[in-house]
């Protein structure tokens, strides 16, 4: 369910969810989605929330540890940091589009810190743009971009990595959503 949660939850913005079957109890979550009465405890939004905040936690933990890690190749460290900023921006972009006000967490939390206040979408979009601009602006030692420019420059083992082009495209999409043109 977690792999299709985004596609299902994003349908609340449209009118494409229909429960199918013989009774009113068939696909109850889908029926609630169609009637705009989705609960936060329903599988789809809960799975998305968990998936994205797990990714954000991992990015934040990564940022906390990366500078203390030993690297033989500093260009690799720069690439990983740029990819981390891209991923955190990606996770927050989906969260803010689907849920509006969400907690904006930029450091790893302990269980004592779990009760976080929700941030206004403007603050979340600002952080998304900051993360993407950071990813785009990170450089290797020779001054070239830290991220690989395009997906076709990867060998098969690295397909799916974040690229400079992906970061620029996501930034454009973020600005379109935030300014209301999309």
Predicted regions and their residues:
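Conserved, well-structured interaction surfaces
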Residues: 24-99, 113-126, 132-159
């Amino acid at each position: 369910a977690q792999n299709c949660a985004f596609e299902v939850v994003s349908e609340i913005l449209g009118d494409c969810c229909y429960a199918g079957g013989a009774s009113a109890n068939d696909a109850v979550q889908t029926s609630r989605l169609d009637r705009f009465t989705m609960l936060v405890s329903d599988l789809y939004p809960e799975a998305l929330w968990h998936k994205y905040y797990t990714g954000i936690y991992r990015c934040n933990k990564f940022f906390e540890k990366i500078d203390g890690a030993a690297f033989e190749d500093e260009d690799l460290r720069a690439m990983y940091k740029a990819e981390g900023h891209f991923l955190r921006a990606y996770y927050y972009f989906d969260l803010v589009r689907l849920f509006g006000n969400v907690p904006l967490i930029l450091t790893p939390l302990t269980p004592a810190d779990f009760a976080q206040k929700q941030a206004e979408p403007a603050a979340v979009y600002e952080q998304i743009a900051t993360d993407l601009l950071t990813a785009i602006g990170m450089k290797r030692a020779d001054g070239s971009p830290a991220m690989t420019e395009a997906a076709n420059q990867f060998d098969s083992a690295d397909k799916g990595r974040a690229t400079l082009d992906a970061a620029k495209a996501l930034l454009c999409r973020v600005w379109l959503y935030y300014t209301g043109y999309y």
